[in-house]
Every structure is written in C-alpha cells, then in structure tokens.
C-alpha cells in the first residue's frame, strides 16, 4: 500500500479542491492510502471516501505570505510540517502540498532530508510541448544560484526521472543557453557543457534555446534555478496570454468570430488542454529522500488527482530509492 501524506490546507481552493481530488484518486487507485492533515471539520465537509483515508487534525497552517524557513521552524503543528514529518518518520511514503512553495522546499530540505551526495535538490516539472509529450525541466527555482556540478547533477536526476517515471528509454538532455553552439554562454554554462558532454551515461544533445522548448527539442532541460523559474513563469504567462487573446478576439469579433469559434470548438479545447497544468501533475523536489511534490497553488480537484497519480507512479517505479542508490554508489 502506497501511503501519501497530503497537506489539506495548502492552496487557493483548500480544502475543497484538495479533498475532492483525493476522493477521486481513492476511487480510481486501490493501492493508495491517504493521510489528510488539516482542520478536521472543514475536511469532512468534502470527504466522501470512507476507506484507506485518515484525517490528522491540526488548526495550524502555513500561509502564502509566511517566510518559508521561519514558518517551518515556528509552526511545528502546521499541516504541511506534520505531513513532511510523517514521511521522515516512515508513516508515509510521499508528501503533497499546494501551499507555500518556499515552505515546502524548506520542509523537503530540513525535514525529509537530502539524498547522500546530492548537493542541491532541484525543483522539476513536466512542461507542455506542441506534440503533447512534454519535457522535464529543472531547476525551476529551488536554488537561486548554482554551480556547474549542481547542473550536472540535475541532468542525471532529470534523465533518471524521464527513464523511470515517463518511460523514455534514452532521454535527450539539453542545456538551456543563449545559443546552440558549444561556445555559447557564460562561464557557468560553458563549464556545465563540458561536464555534460563528458558524461557518457547521458544522452546529451548540447545547448538548447528557450524558443525551442515547447517544440520538444529535448526530453530533459537543465537550467540554474533563477533562469528556470523565469522560463517557467514565461511559459505560464504566455499560455494564459494566448488563451486571453483568443477569448477577446472571439467575444469582440461579432457573429462571424463566434460562429468560427463554434466550428473550432474541439480544436480550441485541445489547445487549452495542451496548455493546462491540470493533467500534468506537480513539481517534484528531486534529490530528497522521498517524493516531495508541489501542485500549483490554484490547483483544482483534477490537478490534485493528477498529482496523486504522478506520486503513485513515482512510488511504483521506486525512482527515489533508485536515485539514492545511484548517487550513494551502493
């Protein structure tokens, strides 16, 4: 039985969206058990599942504007902290939250703990591509500064995840840079390029540019945390902007535009689905001793369900334990 500790109070629509996603996951997956951490009375308003689910009551939660490290240290009984402690103590196999990203990263670092020989765990997510296959990118903001050695580790971690969780036999690994030539980039990118090119265990395809990411140029894209987070926000903003422009053009374009939209309804729905994070799952803090997964703060029940499905796959493939063995040399 796979045990998942869920912060029921994190996110814009908690606890309703969280609990409704849990209800659906428990209905579809008979091999998972969920521990819900949060306000019992509020959780029970939405909980319909009766088997393989438990509620651990707490009145305390971490707010979106709390300073991450201070919140983890001072709010000992916060729903997120208790969920992370359950993983540390072996009472759960993974933790999920839609709450404060920085606080969850701190909980992953300081409570769950790093895998031996991994210097800086990175935040990784599967982002959309036009062919629907997606690509894994890290670091998406767990670390503001990185060394070439960190980026090399991210390449290994991302490749490992793509193989074991996404089923890609030889993941193409690309280094995000300001040009595709091997001579491009600042000293960090140049040093990283040399490390990746020398690692025969990686299917390194060289530098990749941001404009090509959504065309599926690589299966794994490596970046420092600052750049990766900026790219992530740009992709999110562009997706929302495109959908907003289409909506404005349709609603303000008169009868012809509305008729055209009706004829293109299926195509537009497909586009919206491709750009939607709800089906993808959450961002994984990769490099800690158990799956620590952050789903989007504005996640609905569908996104929570998809993230639980993602965690289930991670536990099923034992990717974290395999990663630990790989890096510890055991």
From Swiss-Prot:
Signal peptide: none annotated. HAMAP family: PlsX. It catalyses: a fatty acyl-[ACP] + phosphate = an acyl phosphate + holo-[ACP]. One of its GO terms (cellular component) is cytoplasm. The lineage of its organism: Bacteria, Bacillati, Bacillota, Bacilli, Lactobacillales. GO terms for molecular function: phosphate:acyl-[acyl carrier protein] acyltransferase activity. This is Phosphate acyltransferase. Catalyzes the reversible formation of acyl-phosphate (acyl-PO(4)) from acyl-[acyl-carrier-protein] (acyl-ACP). This enzyme utilizes acyl-ACP as fatty acyl donor, but not acyl-CoA. PANTHER family: FATTY ACID/PHOSPHOLIPID SYNTHESIS PROTEIN PLSX, PHOSPHATE ACYLTRANSFERASE. GO terms for biological process: fatty acid biosynthetic process; phospholipid biosynthetic process. It comes from Streptococcus pneumoniae serotype 4 (strain ATCC BAA-334 / TIGR4). InterPro entries: FA_synthesis, Phospholipid_synth_PlsX-like.
